[in-house]
C-alpha cells in the first residue's frame, strides 16, 4: 500500500507505460489509509506533498510522464479544504495543457472530506484559480457560505470577527 514518490520515479519507468496512475496527497495516504488503498487498487500509486515538494517540478514531471509513458488514466486525490493540496489538481490540469495531447489519458479528480471520497470536475480546479469567478458563484448562490461554515475553521473565525 505504500505509495511511490512521484518526484523520485523515472518518467519512462516500465511500470508507467499505459498504466492507470494515482497521484495522492501524502495526507490522504496517512489520514485515510482505507481511501488510499481503495484508490490504489489496479493503479500505480504515487504520493506527493505540495507543501514540501515544488509544484512546478511536479507539473513538469506529470507532463513528462504523460508525454513519455502515455498512461491510460491519471487520478488525483487530495484533502478537501487544504490550500496546498489544491495545487495537485492544478498541476495535473496544467501538465495536460502543456503537453497538448489529443490522445490524453482519462482524468479523474477526487477530494477527501471527512473520510468521504468526492469526485470533482477538472473545471472545479480551473475555476478555483480565478477568484473573481468564485466571487460570482458566491453572489449567485450565497448559501455556499453556510456550507463552507460547516467545514472551514478559518471561515468560522472570520465570520465571528465581522
Which role does the model predict for each range below?
Residues 1-162:
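Iron-sulfur-associated redox domains of electron-transfer enzymes in respiratory
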